[in-house]
Design a protein with these regions (language model features):
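PLP-dependent amino-acid enzyme catalytic core
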Residues: 1-401, 408-469
Length: 469
């Protein structure tokens, strides 16, 4: 069973909690209006609810919010105010406005009225199928999971409720391990609708008491679930909207479930169209339909043909190679190859076949750097004798954002590698290497001062295999 919240007027479940919270306000509070901070589905839910209830609504959004989202909120009747470079700054401004102007602040998840509104999905699920065994619910701030769990456990306690988190924003898992809500240092933004650094206090209390289990999934698994939904019902889900299905599939595989009646919540469909390219590319890996390999072969005539013969009838999905001017005649060639597979175990079989034929092979299927950047950069390697450090960056997309990044980066260190990629989401990705040694403390300090989310990738196997000297 699938509960389709993408069919809401704002294409997301968020209108339920916002409407319930705003409907419960007193006449005087309604007269004064409401305020919230959001750059996502909650913003549209509040704006639409205000229009339905005849209230004014101020939506504070970060200045880096894509114009398409600003326009969507304004089209629903919300008054948008842009403030700050991130959500925390926008929330602080919304809180200030609430106090200064006597407005009611509508929280995105950690509010009993919002939780109750989201919980109505649980009632409709039971009405849709009273014989369910398990329900899978996406978890961001926890409002949806808490609301659905409390209602189902009250009416049908035998139904198990499973929370599903993205592995790069698993704030509930962190809180369960720590015994209390914990602020994550970094969250991935692929599944933006659940990209929450810290679960709510009330939602954590309820989720800990009522959820039967929690499972985490990857971007690849989520992308595969987006495609599954399209194949089954011809709906295009946003990544966070497909999260519950990704969790359902993982849970079934890990626990060898069969014969049970399962349901998941398709929580939203506010997808940036250009993100589909990235999702389509990653869904093959998420479905275990593609293996990504780095293979060393002799740099000699006929070596490609011999390599292909080892693969046999298997379908090659990608083959990247470039002769480097710095390579000597005795240096081997390194190729980046994608191979279509029918099942997960076939990855190991392909690697074994290649190794038996005398090739050195690295399985890069689960290597994020390889899938996002390196596959587009196969070519020359670093200059011999020049030390190099590699960093990946995440920065908000907006007009001129790349130029601003380069200005902030400065010219103190020589850039030896650069790759920029946008997947249509609100954040862009950059891979950048500098001519610097591991003991260059000044470079590390400079990275910390930039103000961008970053990771050092110097030891990444895909980088070492294809691009490092």
């Amino acid at each position: 069973e699938v509960k389709r919240e993408d069919l809401q007027t704002v294409h997301s479940f968020k209108i339920r909690g916002a409407y319930n919270a705003m409907r419960s306000l007193s006449p005087a509070e309604r007269e004064r209006g409401v305020v919230t901070a959001s750059a996502g589905n909650h913003a549209q839910g509040v704006a639409r609810s205000a229009a339905l209830l005849g209230m004014s609504a101020i939506i504070v959004m970060p200045t880096v919010t894509p114009q398409i989202k600003v326009d969507a909120v304004r089209a629903l009747g919300g008054e948008v105010r842009l403030h700050g470079d991130n959500f925390d700054a926008a929330k602080a401004e919304a809180t200030r406005l609430a106090e200064a102007e006597g407005l009611s602040y509508i929280a995105p998840f950690d509010d009993p009225r919002v939780i109750a509104g989201q919980g109505t999905i649980g009632l409709e699920l039971i009405q849709q199928d009273a014989h369910l065994d398990r329900v899978f619910v996406p978890v961001g701030g926890g409002g949806l999971a808490a609301g659905v769990a409390v209602l189902i456990k009250q009416l049908m306690p035998g139904i198990k409720v499973i929370g599903v988190e993205h592995e790069e924003s698993a704030c509930l898992k962190a809180a369960l391990l720590g015994g209390e809500p914990i602020t994550l240092h970094h969250v991935g933004l692929f599944a933006e609708g659940v990209a929450v650094r810290r679960i709510g206090e009330e939602t954590f209390r309820m989720c800990r008491a009522l959820l039967d289990d929690v499972v985490t999934v990857s971007s690849d698994e989520t992308s595969a679930a987006v495609r599954d939904i399209f194949d089954d019902v011809r709906a295009i889900s946003e990544p966070s909207g497909a999260l519950a299905l990704a969790g359902l599939k993982r849970y079934v595989a890990e626990h060898h479930l069969s014969g049970e009646r399962l349901a998941f919540i398709l929580s939203g469909a506010n997808l940036n169209f250009h993100q589909l390219r990235y999702i389509s590319e990653r869904s093959e890996i998420g479905e275990q339909r593609e293996a990504i390999l780095g293979v060393t072969i002799p740099e000699e005539q006929g070596s490609f043909l011999r390599f292909a013969s080892v693969l046999g009838a298997r379908s090659v999905t990608e083959f990247n190679y470039r002769l480097s001017a710095a390579r000597t005649e005795t240096d081997p060639a390194r190729i980046f190859v994608g191979v279509r597979i029918a099942r997960r175990q076939e990855r190991a079989e392909i690697v074994a076949d290649l190794e038996e034929a005398g090739y050195d092979v690295i399985d890069l299927t689960d290597d994020e750097l390889a899938k996002v950047h390196v596959r587009s950069m196969i070519g020359g390697r670093a200059t011999p004798g020049v030390p190099e450090r590699l960093f990946s960056f995440l920065f908000p997309e907006s007009p001129g954002a790349l130029a601003h990044f380069l200005q902030v980066l400065g010219t103190r260190w020589n850039i030896t590698l650069f790759h920029y990629r946008t997947d249509g989401a609100d954040y862009g990705r950059i891979l950048c290497a500098f001519a610097a040694g591991p003991d260059d403390v000044e470079l590390t300090e400079h990275m910390d001062r930039l103000g961008y989310s970053y990771n050092e990738e110097t030891t990444d196997p895909a980088f070492r295999f294809f691009l490092a000297r």
